[in-house]
């Protein structure tokens, strides 16, 4: 550890799929690992193997064949606190190799996170990890900071949940936030399903990770879905092959764009919901008429599920069709948007003006976990 990292703030973005952790002031997270805790499915027979009763992150991923994998964060909200504690412990001690009691820690949360959840996060940080200070920031707001704006509407879509969050002069407008429980994990499940129609069977939690890799490497968003379907039916120009870990090669065609099309047509997976273009529009329409123009001109994409090639052009097309014809519409898709929440956290925690915003251990001891609602908004 170098000297100047004595009390640098830590930034930990806990996503449903990946945990991003690092030091404030850095331009990228030091550690990015899957938010998974794995427990052995079988009885250990070899003595002295040093088998553990649980594995976290990449280690769980590499031993996935013998483990049952569980995600403690579902739809952006922490549901299993014991496992979540393991993930935080892993990020501090194994990944960043720091003592949390020496560093102020910035955590992130989903918009519209239940109040009890924030309190529990605060409690664990101060009581289990003894941090000197902490803060909880809303993910979408951090993404907007990272893009260098204070006004705009963020479409934040990760592994567990998708949100539209309109932000004006740095304040999220809670009445207009839209939440859609459809994100990367659902797309992976849907791809598993449509691949099985092709005769490829993927069932276990370990095989799901293979399908996730296929999705990340080969899927894209069609500009015009019907046209693309016709092209796929009449020629093999859209087909790609993928080699499985055992050497078997599979071919995938229209599944490449049918999978992410679900974002625009949730009925594909039986959801009665508007697509991401409509939720964006609805969110803007819930805002004051005077600020809509600024929101239309600043549509910021954020999160891993916005990484599909073609998604920005498609959003531009769909929102243009919904909005008033004279409106200027701009979709901003920063290349580093996979980590823009973390980057925004890194920027925020290193601002001199932010230093008075931290919740200190002393304030926590005086007021208890509910202090988080007064200090973080």
UniProtKB/Swiss-Prot annotation:
Family annotation (InterPro entries): Actin, Actin/actin-like_CS, Actin_CS, ATPase_NBD
Modified residues (N-acetylglutamate): 3
Keyword field: Acetylation, ATP-binding, Cytoplasm, Cytoskeleton, Hydrolase, Methylation, Muscle protein, Nucleotide-binding, Oxidation
PANTHER family xrefs: ACTIN (PTHR11937)
SUPFAM superfamilies in UniProt: Actin-like ATPase domain
Coiled coil: none
PTM sites of type Methionine (R)-sulfoxide: 46, 49
One example GO MF annotation: hydrolase activity
Lineage top rank: taxon: Eukaryota
Quaternary structure and partners: Polymerization of globular actin (G-actin) leads to a structural filament (F-actin) in the form of a two-stranded helix. Each actin can bind to 4 others.
SMART domains xrefs: ACTIN (SM00268)
Function per UniProt: Actins are highly conserved proteins that are involved in various types of cell motility and are ubiquitously expressed in all eukaryotic cells.
Subcellular location: Cytoplasm, Cytoskeleton
Reactions that this protein is recorded to catalyse: ATP + H2O = ADP + phosphate + H(+)
Organismal lineage: Eukaryota, Metazoa, Chordata, Craniata, Vertebrata
Enzyme nomenclature, EC number: 3.6.4.-
UniProt name for this protein: Actin, aortic smooth muscle
Residues carrying N-acetylcysteine: 2
Annotated GO biological process: mesenchyme migration; positive regulation of gene expression
Any one of the GO CC terms: filopodium
The keyword GTP-binding is annotated on this UniProt entry: no
Extra remark: In vertebrates 3 main groups of actin isoforms, alpha, beta and gamma have been identified. The alpha actins are found in muscle tissues and are a major constituent of the contractile apparatus. The beta and gamma actins coexist in most cell types as components of the cytoskeleton and as mediators of internal cell motility.
Sequence positions bearing Tele-methylhistidine: 75
Family indicated by similarity: Belongs to the actin family.
Post-translational changes noted in the entry: Oxidation of Met-46 and Met-49 by MICALs (MICAL1, MICAL2 or MICAL3) to form methionine sulfoxide promotes actin filament depolymerization. MICAL1 and MICAL2 produce the (R)-S-oxide form. The (R)-S-oxide form is reverted by MSRB1 and MSRB2, which promotes actin repolymerization. Methylated at His-75 by SETD3.
